A protein has these predicted regions:
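Short, conserved beta-strand element in jelly-roll/cupin
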Residues: 73-74, 78-88, 92-94, 100-111
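Sec-dependent N-terminal signal peptides
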Residues: 11-18
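A short hydrophobic beta-strand segment most commonly corresponding to one strand
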Residues: 141-156
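His/acidic/aromatic-lined binding-pocket segments of jelly-roll/cupin-type domains
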Residues: 70, 77-80, 117-118, 125-126
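A short, N-terminal "cap"/entry segment at the start of jelly-roll beta-barrel domains
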Residues: 5-8, 20-74, 156
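Conserved metal-binding segment of the jelly-roll/cupin
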Residues: 119-138
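Short hydrophobic/aromatic-rich beta-strand segments that constitute the beta-sheet cores
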Residues: 60, 88-90, 145
Length: 156
């Protein structure tokens, strides 16, 4: 089990590195970002973003219940589960999908028709490419997970 978690952590770190490298973030930058444990713990208590830049976002996500169907036109979600279990449905078609108010690249809907279900639990890594419908269902709270959102920036 320890090997599985170690492998999952390595995959998450490699994904973060690839996301940053693909957006030129290994060039000279003004400074590194440090987030202390107090800030991270507080973010998970509410479920909120930790870092948001033009090339990537890192969220401390918390789910207490199932969510709506979502499509991120530009963001690929790289998810690492810290605690709890949930089923995520991906693919298929969004039922009653609408563009989220104030955005042009975020779609929300009631559910997903014809998708594939995957059970997620502690230590799992799950990647949802941009443009792929996804919805969390059957959530056992609290479901805590990091999401690294690698932004496509419109390059397709």
């Amino acid at each position: 089990m320890k090997t599985r978690h170690r492998t999952a952590r390595r995959l998450v770190l490699a994904s973060i590195g690839l996301a940053l490298a693909s957006h030129g973030h290994f060039q000279a930058s003004p400074s590194a970002t440090y987030l202390d444990a107090t800030r991270v713990t507080a973010a998970f208590a509410k479920g909120m973003p930790l870092v948001e830049t033009g090339g990537y976002k890192i969220h401390a996500s918390r789910r207490e219940a199932p969510g709506v169907a979502e499509v991120h036109v530009q963001d690929t979600d790289i998810i690492y589960v810290l605690e709890g279990t949930a089923t995520v449905v991906t693919g298929g078609d969004v039922v009653n999908g609408r563009t989220l108010e104030g955005t042009i690249d975020e779609i929300r809907g009631a559910s997903i028709r014809g998708g594939t279900a995957q059970r997620l639990s502690k230590g799992d890594v799950f990647i949802v490419p941009n443009g792929v419908p996804h919805q969390f269902t059957e959530v056992q709270a609290p479901f805590l997970y990091y999401v690294v959102k690698a932004t496509d920036g419109g390059r397709r």
